[in-house]
Amino acid sequence: MSENEQFSQMEAKARARMKERGVEVSDIAELVFFLQKKYHPDLTIDECTLNVNRVLAKREVQNAILTGIELDVLAEQKKLSEPLQTMLEIDESLYGVDEVLAFSIVNIYGSIGFTNYGYIDKEKPGILKRLNDKSTGECHTFLDDIVGAISAAASSRLAHRARHTE
């Protein structure tokens, strides 16, 4: 069975679009590890990856990924109307719709996700640093927040599951 045969068509498309934009599941798993390692000393990257995969299986997450990436690509291609074109190109701080889309992911596993998201959005470790680099000419206004939100949701899922096994 190929990698994509194990996923729904939507999930496979969302994963493929992230990969096209330079984001691997392992990148997001590293963010989960960054968020959770001090709370779970025996945590492994495999556990983090499992939780990322579970988050990616959610339809609302797939919808957010596909929508956000499409808007980022259209902004790169300069196919949006003003003032939206400029707001996305410069990642206008008062725009906020990118965060609203990310919150739809963060909220899946409860309020702990918001704390995780706020922290990782501020620190911008790993892949988030690259996605926020405006010098590349790429637009990741939505994708950086979506990746942060997926890591926050996966961290929340991990925390909830760990709590029930103690």
UniProtKB/Swiss-Prot annotation:
GO terms for biological process: lipid metabolic process. It holds the Pfam family PgpA. GO terms for molecular function: phosphatidylglycerophosphatase activity. To B.subtilis YpjQ. This is Uncharacterized protein YutG. It comes from Bacillus subtilis (strain 168). The gene is yutG.
